[in-house]
Amino acid sequence: MSSQASQRSSSTSAVAQKTRERRKSKSRRRCWFGCLWLSSRVSLIRSSSRFSRSPEPDESLTAIDKVMSIINEKPLKMAHILKTARFVNDVSFSERKQFVECGVIHHLLELIGETAISDFSASSRSADEQKRRARRNSSASLSHKGTGYGTGSTRSRWDIERTVEEKLIREEHLTWLLSILNSFMLGWPTTDNLKTKPEELVHMTEIAIKLIADSSVLSILEYNLRNDSFFDVSEHIEIYQALLETAASMAATPGLVPFLVRPYTSSAKSIAKELIPRFKENILSIQARWGGTLEETNFRMAEFTAKVTLLSDYVINAARAYEQTLPPEQRIQTATHRRPSHSGLHSKMQGPKDDETIYKNKMQELQLQTAKFIGDFGKLCVPYVFRKEAKNINPFSPHLRDRTKRIAKELASIANALPLNASNSIYVCYDEGRVDIIKVLISGPDDTPYANGLFEFDIFFPTGYPFSPPKCAFLTTGSGNVRFNPNLYNDGKICLSILGTWEGRPEEKWNPYCSLMQVLVSIQGLIFVKDPYFNEPGFERYQGTDRGDEYSRKYNLQIEHATLNYAIREQLKKPSEHFKEVIEKHLWLKREAILKQAQAWIDNVSNDFGDDKMSKRKDVFAFETGFNPATQERVIHNLIQELQAMQSPFAKEEAEESERLKREQSEKEEKQKKEAAALAEIEREKRELELDFQRRRSSVLATHVAVIRTQPTGDYSVPSVNEPSTSS
């Protein structure tokens, strides 16, 4: 037993020994692998740290190598772009030639073209995407939805925040890429280097000039500087400042100035002579008018305005200096668009006197006007649909300051963006003390049943603006008796996806990046259309059929009468106080067209009701109201008589203009008389001098002859007429 026990114990100890050895071996292996893993991890961390610092300047690398290593990265990081601008700026002008020779500038210009957000970048959209858009926007698909009510599926997902964020990232990249280019051309910041002499820019060789001139830089400048929306510019100050700095950097190089002066395509405009002067004028005029509202803490905008003035003047002066070297026939003839001031209206009326030109010149100063909506003790003194909402808001509350500034920016922008022509126009009236209270007047477009009519709206910006849409109400309803459109109810409600009053696709709904201008254009373009009958969802099934066309024609006949009666006649008889001048002048300028329109309606109704079929009125529309041909025709005849008896609202202005012209003519004639009298006096004095000269000459000659006679011999000289004779 003892031997067996000893054998078992020895075998157990042997097993235990082997187990311990195996454990030690595993432990050693784990330690070895652990050390190997740790060392590899440390090396990876070190390499990653080196990479994270890259492309931190390596002392052994030149500036060219540093810049090349950065701009060749995929994707290009913002932090590295900032370093590149510093590297390029620190290099001397003579050393910058290497950037051109090594292809750095060529690659940089390609990156700028790829990053630019503009119309020409949209043209590179894939063919498949274009087909998808065409299918989505085709008339066939839209005709089955009801205009203005939204199209497509309401379940579609569209992340507006992500879209805007991506755009801002690209815009920031473009801003700094342009800054790198400016660092190369002139130096950065550009405003500190404007006094650099052209002969110092030795790196701007013919190759560098050709690279920049042939790149997308000119098209980017031309596209973005066309923008006259103050709201858009104020929201993207950095990119516009970079664009102006790029133009100034190019203007510092004499070889690039011609490309700023001459339009780069037949459809483009001169950057230096048209776009930049207009951009500067818009910014300065808006800042002067709205500075008190935009103000207070907005030093950023004030600084931007100062830079706009400095950089614009630099470019304009460079363009003028260049054109002084050209013969007059080779200089670029441009006509910079200018909004007229609020004085001297008729002095602006130069050029052809067609109806379109006359309408614009007469109505332009009335398009954006102010009025007093708030009376004593902060009470509204005009009719207003959203009176209760306006009363419950303290416009001077600190938490509404951003809302007020946003509204002011939008109003400043629409001054240059509102449509104005004889066919269709938009007029806006607001109170300078309460910019959240707005009244709008929209004229009906030609070739629609709303032609020449004037339709009034009340608009209010709620406290949640711009995160919630503005509130809009339609006022031209004939005291609730007429519904002008399936989208416009006789109680003033407006059905549009952008206003949140109807379901629509996410991209058709309101978002914080929408604006008042989009709402106004949507109302004008989506509601006041040629065939409003098909705006009603469900009626689209008749579109393209004989029955549908007949329904639409008869519906339009009723809308035309409502327009003539309520949007023209009632406006003429009882104009809104704040739009009275607009209404009177609009109707006077369009009276001939309205008379033809009224007579055409009478003829169409007479033709229709001469038909027995039509007189039975088998087809009745649910949304037709007050159909009475005899009464309606009588109303239109009254309108014709009232228009024919209408007195010109321009009579006072025309009398003043006539008086001014007479005064100018009288002053001109008086000036001519004075000039003629002065010339006559000069001629008289001239004749007197000539006679005096002749008398003196005769006297001298006579004296000389007398001397000769008394002295028979001797040599005598003839004295000068102007000199006194010694003998005399």
UniProtKB/Swiss-Prot annotation:
Q: Name one GO molecular function term.
A: ligase activity
Q: Which GO terms describe its cellular component?
A: nucleus; trans-Golgi network
This protein's gene is called ubc-17
- Note the Gene3D superfamilies from the entry: Ubiquitin Conjugating Enzyme (3.10.110.10)
Annotated InterPro entries: UBQ-conjugat_E2_core (IPR000608), UBQ-conjugating_enzyme/RWD (IPR016135)
Spell out the SMART domains in the cross-references: UBCc
In this protein, which residues make up the domain named UBC core?
402-568
Q: Which SUPFAM superfamilies match?
A: UBC-like (SSF54495)
The GO annotation for biological process reads: negative regulation of apoptotic process
Q: Which family does it belong to?
A: Belongs to the ubiquitin-conjugating enzyme family.
Q: In what ranges is there compositional bias, type Polar residues?
A: 710-728
> What species is given as this protein's source?
Caenorhabditis elegans
Q: Where is this region: Disordered?
A: 1-23, 123-155, 649-678, 709-728
> Which catalytic residues are annotated?
495 (glycyl thioester intermediate)
Q: What is this protein called?
A: Probable ubiquitin-conjugating enzyme protein 17
Q: Where are the compositionally biased (Low complexity) regions?
A: 1-17
> What Pfam families does the record point to?
UQ_con
User: What sections of the sequence does the record tag as coiled-coil?
Assistant: none
Keywords of the record: Ligase, Transferase, Ubl conjugation pathway
Basic and acidic residues bias: where? 658-678
